[in-house]
Amino acid sequence: MTVEQKSTLIVAIVGMPARGKTYTARKIARYLNWRGHDAKVFNVGNYRRKHLGAKQPATFFDPENPEGRRARKQMAMAALEDMIGWLSDGGEVAIYDATNSTRVRRGLIQKTADEHQTKLIFVESICDMPSIIEENIRETKISSPDYRGIDEQHAVTDFRKRIAFYHQAYEPLQPDEGSWVKIIDVGRQIITNEITGYLPGRIVFFLMNIHLGKRLVWLTRHGESQYNVAGKIGGDSMLSARGEKFSTALSAHFSSPKRTPSEVWTSTLHRTIQTSKHLAIPTRHIKNLDELNAGVRDGLTYEQIKSRFPEEYAARKQNKFGYRYPQGESYQDLIRRLDPIIVELERKAKPVLIVAHQAVLRALYAYLMDIPPEQCPFLDMPLHTVIQLEPKAYGCAESRTSLDSSSDSATASSILGSNGGIS
């Protein structure tokens, strides 16, 4: 099987267990997909779990165990073959997530990439910081499918043995192994070797701005605005009385020391600034967080657009992700505008609260939850609701808290979610 003559890329992850490899692989894929590239992770561990079962003892990973070594190679080859097939069928960036801990294994990946005329870069995660390794071991015990339902102490002990076996055979990347990036001590140092081309360069830039530390991200829309009440889109209106109540409730919600952002980000529009005014937290007003631009239709209701400009209304209904009102923006445009926000958000090591607008939060939420960008116009972003997100190695934990003071808050949120902003 040969990959068609087009620009394709393999990103092969390298590193010992508990160094954040899967977390990094998923982040790369998520970021590239969000930017419009077709990226997919091929995790060799998933192949092992599917075909051999998840409950393999640590001795399975002993380099002196011939049966285990043979079985692991078979799974690695199966993932590699599927990855090449996916690229041949139109995929763009394949992330090969495994330890790839020896020169022999990496040479096999390089040979495969060369045979199929696909560019290859290695991304090696190196960490000798005991505190980080310990935290990753505990996180793996909690979230890895390998240890689901296993006693905590047994899981940790077994995983430590697995790490020790990998350490016996581990060979770090060398300068003669082609294009690679080394991430040392969760981003303290980045070393690159023979990196060329737009996508590899973009990946390196992204990797320079991520970290493995835990932190919370909160998303909330501004309080109900006067335009929300009138059903109008866009504009720069002030909060309604109900929106003002939410502003006060938001401040009370974040008054707990256990739930305090290090920083608040808002747009430059009045309704987000008003919403955050009671928060005694450093606040930044960022133009890139402004609501999706409705162009010449700004200030109209959807009923007015439907009656006066039926062709535009129908065109947007047909392609909500790609359509832009005259002199306005589409969701696709918005995602490009938000790219610096995403990079800055990834860089932040401390919790952040973002007070923004429906379309903007849909796009940010889609990124953080690894939802295809094309689906973001249809995500539910109700007013007066705080969404708490906690990125983890195998996903993102979410909780939602309604701060609506009205007696029928669920109904109000549902109604306003459809017309209280750019929908």
Predicted regions and their residues:
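Acidic, low-complexity terminal tails and accessory targeting/binding regions
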Residues: 1-4, 171-175, 179-180, 189-216, ...
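Extreme N-terminal, non-catalytic leader segments
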Residues: 1-10, 35-38, 47, 211-212
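Hydrophobic anchor at the beta1->P-loop junction of P-loop NTPases
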Residues: 13, 354
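The conserved Walker
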Residues: 17
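Conserved substrate/cofactor phosphate-moiety recognition/catalytic segment
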Residues: 22-84, 90-91, 105, 129-134
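Phosphate-coordination/substrate-recognition cap region in phosphate-metabolizing enzymes
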Residues: 98, 103-107, 111-112, 119-143, ...
